[in-house]
Amino acid sequence: MPLALWALALSAFAIGTTEFVIVGLIPTIAASLNVSVPSAGLLVSLYALGVAVGAPVLTALTGRVPRKRLLLALMVLFTLGNLVAWMAPNYAALMAARVLTGLAHGVFFSIGSTIATRLVPKEQAASAIALMFTGLTVALVTGVPIGTFIGQHFGWQATFLAVSVLGVVAIVGSAILVPSDIAGDQPSSLLTQLAVLKKPRLLLVYAMTTLGYGGTFIAFTYLAPILQEVAGFEASTVGLVMLVYGVSVAAGNIWGGRLADRHGPVRALQFVFALLVLVLLVLSFTAPSKPLVLLTVLAWGAVAFGNVPGLQVYVVRRAERDAPQAVDVASSLNIAAFNVGIALGAWGGGLIVAHLGLMATPWIGALVVVGALLLTTLAGWLDRRDGVPAKPARIAPQFN
């Protein structure tokens, strides 16, 4: 794989750490800022909303900016946002910092996905996207547990300072490794690019993404409280459990990419979503047992991110058919869909916790993922009806 993909993965590592470390710090932040656990959970939703707004709008507005220059600018914005979080004196300031970093996140992953697919032959597109998103999974393996440890022992502000340092490292890595001659979309007007919202098949993919991730985050947002209050883990060991989850996620992400390359994204997604439904249902019964919940979290990690390569490569392929003038924007809208799902899942999870309790989140999340599975099955049927092949023919990488 090209070195540029590793540069993208390095940036994704920094972004993934700041996105997901908040899950392990929710109880700590709630106690520090004197807010409720559901209120602290809104920090997940606000970040996701920043991504959802920033991804399509800023991607469309920056369509004429050279890709490498844009990547570097985004990482600078990301680093500044984490510095604001480090210095945040109260809950409102921390919320603003989360939105700011979310704006950078959305555009990074939208253009990063299309860059990744253009660096390799087309039949390796899902694996290339998986490699870039490996940065997120490695963040779960190392960044999130370490960040959780730092936050619990040195204050949550110290975690964001550490992530700012990661941002600087990512800027240097991208400046050195990302080439300047990557092919982008042909320049087009903002209205032309946003016309992807009129494409029913793309809207179907966005709905698949929103439900698939929304269902997961109904439960995942409150994993730390479940581990502490239901399973009986000490707060100091939550980071270790997140490490177990992250190791499994790293394997699942690569596995999901290879599955999508081998069998096509739709078939891969059907399999992954079905497994995710099963794991969330099992969690409803295993949470009170420390050994069993550890095994369930391990299985959860293996499928939780296994759908990312398939969803992202599928939206790129659909956009190349339905909106070839706005592939980056179509990709960005799928990043927005991921984060709309995260925001709605975290918000809905808070309502569920407040009214039904923590242990209602896994089985309700499973029901939402069933919706994603049904929509994926519909997408596959429509592809077969239209004669769309499950896997593309070989096409060389695209450079200027």
Question: At which residue positions do the language-model features occur?
Answer:
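Helix-breaking motifs and short loop linkers at transmembrane-helix boundaries and internal kinks
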Residues: N34, P66, M87-A93, G232, ...
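Cytoplasmic helix-loop-helix junction between adjacent transmembrane helices
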Residues: A97-L136
